């Protein structure tokens, strides 16, 4: 069994974003049923429905745990069903929530070496006592059997793999700070119980041949849904960057996500990490209908999928 809960479906800033007065965010603040609020992207995954691994620790993690009964303490005065946290990158939106988990509660922190190096370089993350929260490096393309803090097998195996992306904004440097790289700075995560296969790829700058081959025939894929069009933030007057500058491919258009997945025979396709400028967030938008007609679902906080 692969049991997944969407803790947060939106991109950085959430929906509505705290400083956005754009029409969609105003609709969300007004509790428009077609524009429900969403917190910042994160999922929880379990092999038994009892012990969970959080994938990406968003700034909203405390609220996300509170809204998710499966992650509530169950035993004694202090406990947690969260056995570990897995990071797919070192962006502010994926690591900040780690500080919420600093209450001397054992769990395992897993990430690729470049991401662990970013954490090591910032002493604030030493608030997570390494004797209680060990940091475990993940090697690209090497299966890793998840285990509970006591060593008991968790029933899931993950395989991290590089996808095209960029370094976090705060780590940009050099002559081409926005260069798209495929070196482990940004990863996707394959998850399997030995029978079913699911993938979590919240950030991806472009589709590649090897990535197409990897995803073909998958049972479930959560994929980067940041922007509907590459220049939507520029056209809306709410930002100065394109999707490519931020390391995200667009959902629509030639070479976009819908186009790239058209012949991959993925059983269930779900968009996640959706920016507040993306009309996909609006249930009554034409763009939402286009995505649905192409076989895509739009994730929402609390969405639960069991394969």
UniProtKB/Swiss-Prot annotation:
The organism's place on the tree of life at top rank: Bacteria
Family: Belongs to the PqqB family.
The name this protein goes by in its record: Coenzyme PQQ synthesis protein B
Native organism: Gluconacetobacter diazotrophicus (strain ATCC 49037 / DSM 5601 / CCUG 37298 / CIP 103539 / LMG 7603 / PAl5)
A Pfam match: Lactamase_B_2
UniProt pathway: Cofactor biosynthesis; pyrroloquinoline quinone biosynthesis
Alphabetical GO biological process terms: pyrroloquinoline quinone biosynthetic process
Annotated function: May be involved in the transport of PQQ or its precursor to the periplasm.
Keyword terms, alphabetized: PQQ biosynthesis, Transport
């Amino acid at each position: 069994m692969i049991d997944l809960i969407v803790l947060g479906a939106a991109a950085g800033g959430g929906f509505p974003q705290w400083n956005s007065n754009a029409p969609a965010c105003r609709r969300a603040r007004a509790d428009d049923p077609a524009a429900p609020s969403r917190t910042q992207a994160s999922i929880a995954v379990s092999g038994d429905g009892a012990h969970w691994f959080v994938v990406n620790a968003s700034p909203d993690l405390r609220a996300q745990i509170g809204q998710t009964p499966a992650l509530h303490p169950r035993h004694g005065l202090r406990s947690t069903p969260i056995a570990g946290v897995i990071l797919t990158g070192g962006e502010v939106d994926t690591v900040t929530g780690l500080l919420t988990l600093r209450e001397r509660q054992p769990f395992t922190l897993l990430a690729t070496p470049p991401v662990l190096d970013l954490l090591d370089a910032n002493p604030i993350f030493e608030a997570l006592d390494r004797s209680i929260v060990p940091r475990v490096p993940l090697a690209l393309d090497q299966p890793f059997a998840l285990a509970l803090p006591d060593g008991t097998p968790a029933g899931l195996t993950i395989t991290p793999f590089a996808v095209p992306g960029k370094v976090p904004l705060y780590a940009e440097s050099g002559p081409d700070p926005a260069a798209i790289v495929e070196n482990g700075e940004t990863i996707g995560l394959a998850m399997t119980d030995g029978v079913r296969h699911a993938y979590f790829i919240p950030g991806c700058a472009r589709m590649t041949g090897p990535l197409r081959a990897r995803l073909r025939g998958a049972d479930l894929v959560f994929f980067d849904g940041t922007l509907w069009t590459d220049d939507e933030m520029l056209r809306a007057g709410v930002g100065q960057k394109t999707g490519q500058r931020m390391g995200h491919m667009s959902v629509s258009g030639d070479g976009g996500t819908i186009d790239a997945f058209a012949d991959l025979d993925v059983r269930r396709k779900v968009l996640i990490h959706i920016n507040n400028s993306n009309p996909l967030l609006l249930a009554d938008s034409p763009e939402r209908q286009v995505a649905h007609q192409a076989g895509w679902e739009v994730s929402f906080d609390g969405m639960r999928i069991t394969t």
